[in-house]
Amino acid sequence: MKVLVVTETDACCGPMAAAFLSDYSPSIEVVSMGRNPSQSVEFLLVAAMRECLIDLEGYVPKGKDDVGSMDFDVVYECPDMPCPKTLEECRMLRDYVKNEAYLFFRGLIAYGR
């Protein structure tokens, strides 16, 4: 199954959600993109995700031109929050995004996706 995660910038919540969804099942191919992609991912995000053993070092935010005409089975409109200013705030956002991604994943299973 191919899932597209959409956020505004693809610099914070989108990459986190995509990483968690990929982690939940090896049968899910996940791509995240932003409507107005940033130049880079927030460095605090990389540190917070590393604590979950997920490496986003070097991730480059993508836009619609990067995704192109790829086909997706499902689009996940990820809740997009402002990027936190401290590592502790980033951890709280990470945990929120992880929970939201898990609920989305459970919904896919419930509807036989």
Question: Can you describe what each PLM-predicted range is?
Answer:
Residues 1-65:
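Conserved active-site segments centered on acidic
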Residues 27, 71-72:
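A general structural motif
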Residues 66-70:
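Short amphipathic alpha-helix with an adjacent loop that forms part of the alpha/beta core around
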Residues 72, 76-113:
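Phosphate-binding/catalytic loops
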